[in-house]
């Protein structure tokens, strides 16, 4: 069986116009996949040079396959049908290592055609590293490497204003573009680079903050033999992802034309502020996950897919989204409903086995950030507590007993909560405290909730009633009236 390379698999090759920091699965099934579609359907005509930003030889370089690899996109499409689509990606030309090919790295700045910089160096990547110097070959942090590359560009083209870059980080931190820009400016000042360079950074370059959304499941280790048999070639960089994707970029309106999105519309939004889209994702996608997990798991289910195929649990989650979460969010209702519909479709994806226990990690913090804001907003708007979000809190407290049908399961959270719950549930079993007292102790933890939730009218009583119902009747019976 042949391995992918451009000699045996000839096809389009594009001029290098994009630098990408990061060789991982996510960027390859997200950014490079989108660039490949735009190259095929428009005159974007842009090839990617992947820069490996860390010192590692694993996985091997994409250049071993001349930049070629296959994405397999699978899940439920807009009509709810299971689809699996294999695509040979030709947008990546080569990969270079900033550690072993530093001069080649700097030379990227000399190419007049270079226009875009994408990155995903993990959440820890956009951070300051004390001691990074201009002359390091290379510096340790990604922002320092980028500063050096930008200065190379500035110097080579004598500060030409038409030679700046559009920089689009994909790291999962709030306002990632602003954070990256601040660090680049910090290094420029720390390294005493000329004032003209700092002005050029501001005038000629755009740092765009983003929200990225796609579950990328990466190399399909268990299915490789079968998939390669179907493809007819060997691919060491096979990359799998779900059907859904969303790319929200906070940047100039002209970006849509530069990326040729006007000629081939992808699910890419160019917006003035990513905040409402971030809130939408956290509240609907992450919030639904967090509400679902303790309810579904204690109802005897193990994966998100099983939960969505269970009529009662599915109804509970959908009613929580449409009746309690969406009404308090600040975007047009039709946009929110369309996003919610995509989310429930993603939860049903038959190709992804998402274990409920793995999503349950750090459930207390997730409830505070993902559900509590909507619970409180609903109470404020209507004068009554949203029934399902409140029930989800009771289910979460019950989940920390660590026992289902007489069998224990691992609960993962910070040590404080694990010890606290162990103590509280032990006292509850020994009848030292009642259910309402247990709930009041949990909700009074100001340092965690950032407020005293026992002051929210009716909350302690409602959560205690729900918790008693779960303990006395079991999850199935307790949740049924809300389905």
From Swiss-Prot:
GO MF terms listed in the record are: mannitol-1-phosphate 5-dehydrogenase activity; tagaturonate reductase activity
Cite the EC number.
1.1.1.58
Q: Show the catalytic activity.
A: D-altronate + NAD(+) = keto-D-tagaturonate + NADH + H(+)
**Which Gene Ontology biological process is one annotated for this entry?**
mannitol catabolic process
Q: Which cysteines are joined by disulfide bonds?
A: none
Q: Output the Pfam families linked to this UniProt entry.
A: Mannitol_dh, Mannitol_dh_C
InterPro entries membership: 6-PGluconate_DH-like_C_sf (IPR008927), 6PGD_dom2 (IPR013328), Altronate_OxRdtase (IPR023668), Mannitol_DH_C (IPR013118), Mannitol_DH_N (IPR013131), NAD(P)-bd_dom_sf (IPR036291)
Binding locations of NAD(+): 18-29
| A GO CC annotation given for this chain | cytosol
Q: Which UniProt keywords apply?
A: NAD, Oxidoreductase
Q: Which Gene3D superfamilies match?
A: N-(1-d-carboxylethyl)-l-norvaline Dehydrogenase, domain 2 (1.10.1040.10), NAD(P)-binding Rossmann-like Domain (3.40.50.720)
What's the top EC group for this one?
Answer: oxidoreductase
Pathway listed: Carbohydrate metabolism; pentose and glucuronate interconversion
Q: What are the TM regions of this chain, as residue ranges?
A: none
**Please, which domain of life does this record's source organism belong to?**
Bacteria
Q: Which NCBIfam families match?
A: PRK03643.1
Record family assignment: Belongs to the mannitol dehydrogenase family. UxaB subfamily.
Protein name stated in the entry: Altronate oxidoreductase
């Amino acid at each position: 069986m042949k391995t992918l390379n451009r000699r045996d698999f000839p096809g389009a090759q594009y001029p290098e116009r994009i630098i990408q920091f990061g060789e991982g699965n996510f960027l390859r099934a997200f950014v490079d996949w989108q660039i490949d579609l735009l190259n095929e359907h428009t005159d974007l005509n842009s090839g990617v040079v992947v820069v490996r930003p860390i010192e590692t030889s694993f996985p091997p370089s994409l250049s071993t396959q001349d930049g070629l690899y296959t994405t397999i996109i699978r899940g439920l499409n807009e009509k709810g049908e299971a689809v699996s689509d294999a695509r040979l990606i030709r947008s990546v030309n080569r990969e270079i290592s900033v550690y072993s090919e530093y001069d080649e790295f700097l030379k990227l700045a000399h190419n007049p055609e270079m226009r875009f910089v994408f990155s995903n160096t993990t959440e820890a990547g956009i951070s300051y590293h004390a001691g990074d110097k201009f002359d390091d070959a290379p510096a340790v942090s990604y922002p320092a490497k980028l500063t050096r590359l930008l200065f190379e560009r500035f110097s080579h083209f004598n500060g030409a204003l038409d030679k700046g870059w559009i920089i689009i980080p994909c790291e999962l931190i709030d306002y990632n573009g602003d954070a990256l820009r601040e660090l680049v400016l910090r290094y420029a000042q720390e390294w005493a680079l000329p004032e003209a360079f700092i002005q050029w950074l501001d005038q000629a370059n755009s740092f765009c903050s983003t929200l990225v959304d796609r579950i990328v499941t990466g190399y399909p280790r268990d299915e490789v033999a079968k998939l390669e048999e179907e493809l007819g070639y060997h691919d060491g960089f096979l990359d799998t992802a779900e059907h859904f994707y969303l790319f929200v970029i906070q940047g100039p309106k002209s970006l849509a034309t530069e990326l040729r999105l006007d000629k081939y519309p992808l699910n890419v939004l160019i917006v003035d502020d990513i905040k409402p889209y971030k809130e939408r994702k956290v509240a609907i996608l992450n919030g639904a996950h967090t509400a679902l997990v303790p309810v579904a798991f204690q109802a005897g289910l193990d994966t998100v897919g099983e939960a969505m195929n269970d009529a009662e649990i599915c109804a509970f989650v959908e009613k929580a989204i449409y009746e309690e979460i969406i009404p308090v969010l600040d975007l047009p209702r039709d946009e929110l409903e369309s996003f919610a519909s995509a989310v429930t479709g993603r939860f049903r994806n038959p190709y992804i086995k998402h274990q409920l226990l793995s999503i349950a990690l750090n459930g207390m913090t997730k409830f505070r950030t993902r559900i509590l804001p909507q619970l409180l907003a609903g109470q404020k708007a209507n004068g009554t507590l949203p029934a399902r979000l409140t029930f989800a809190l009771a289910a979460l407290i019950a989940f920390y007993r660590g026992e289902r049908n007489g069998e224990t399961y691992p609960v993962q959270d910070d040590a404080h909560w694990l010890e606290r719950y162990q103590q509280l549930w032990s006292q509850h079993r020994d009848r030292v405290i009642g259910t309402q007292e247990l709930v009041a102790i949990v909700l009074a933890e100001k340092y965690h909730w950032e407020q005293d939730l026992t002051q929210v009218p009716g909350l302690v009583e409602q959560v205690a009633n729900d918790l008693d119902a779960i303990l006395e009747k079991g999850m199935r019976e307790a949740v049924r009236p809300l389905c």
